[in-house]
Amino acid sequence: PRVYQIIEEINRRFIIEVQNKYPGNYEKIKKMAIIYDGQVKMAHLAIVAGFSVNGVARLHTEILKNQELKDFYEMMPEKFNNKTNGITQRRFLLHGNQNLAAWITDHIGPDWITDLSQISKLKVYVDDEKALQEFMNIKFQNKQRLAKYILEHNGVEVDPHSIFDVQVKRLHEYKRQLLNILHVIYLYNQIKLHPEMEFYPRTFIFGAKASAAYERAKKIIKLINCVADVVNNDPSIGGKIKVVFIENYRVSNAEMIFAAADVSEQISTASKEASGTGNMKFMLNGAPTLGTMDGANVEIVEEVGQENAFIFGMSADQIINYENHGGYDPDFIYNTDAEIRQVLMQLINGTFSSDTELFRDCLLYTSPSPRDGLLS
């Protein structure tokens, strides 16, 4: 086809450029070629033919420049730049959380609607008890609205006074919904073991869709629902934990979820999330971030201050070092931590499903494998 002939010509001219810049470096030519071994590398074509190449968060851009696209960045650094993803406050605050939007306008005027930097004017109310109580009343109203939706759609009664701990996003292993639900199981075990311990009630809310052919992602959704069935129907824990999986997660119910969240779970394996925008939507609606220094979380934490976020886990550099040099040993963790071992064994001992093989593949993470780069 004519289009392929054009790609061949672009490739021919580009290889000449690479040869001129790196004479005799055939390994470099092989790595950077647009067409190699019968395949057209579309990313290479886009970089060569395009005017500008950008990552979608500062960390993501640096990883592209220093790792994934290092050869191209070294040859044509002027093409590379960062454009951190963004959201519009008009959709996810003005439209999605109308009571909070009205409260903000009452306190600082309407300029924030077209210039979000104006929101910083709210800082003067940080110690104003009346303003803070009004803010929390709005949050509680939003939580009541979501609790009503959950009762109607899931048949689960949740306490709007509990902490709404929320993770809603595409289901993927690197986003670590599995880590989240394993933590829920751990807390469930602790409450069962120590019923007298102080524990403020928490409602764990998940929402996600999995790609059609992504079997493991679908298995994780199944696990979340199985855990929910057990936890929500165990009278011995006194309703201290509830688990909800919101079906058909989409923008219309997302707006309600963002407005009601107390905690925003942004726990991807550092270096794997390009940017994320849910992290922005939650923070815009007054839910602090619990997460890793990944994607746009890095810039959010810089903006709001480390003291206003709950950050854990390894850095992107540490994760990449594990990938390059090894050293992550889940077997050691499994063999030396009885509480983690109990959680993992509950996946296959009938606690959450009579089919003891159903979640066995989730245990593959306890054996060293290439997938361990996700550190789930």
Predicted regions and their residues:
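Gly/Pro-rich turn-and-neighbor structural signature
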Residues: P1-F51, V56, H161-Q190, F199-T203, ...
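Catalytic cores of eukaryotic secretory-pathway lumenal/extracellular enzymes that build
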Residues: V244-V251
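Short acidic alpha-helix that forms the nucleotide-activated donor recognition element
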Residues: S252-A260
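Long, charge-rich alpha-helical interaction segments
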Residues: M345-N349, F359-C362
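Segments forming glycine/polar-rich beta-alpha architectures that bind adenosine-containing cofactors
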Residues: N54-H107, K175-E196
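Extended, charge-enriched "interface" segments that sit outside catalytic cores
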Residues: G96-E157
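A donor-sugar binding/catalytic signature common to diverse glycosyltransferases
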Residues: D262-E307
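Conserved small/polar residues in nucleotide/adenosyl-binding loops
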Residues: Y365-P370
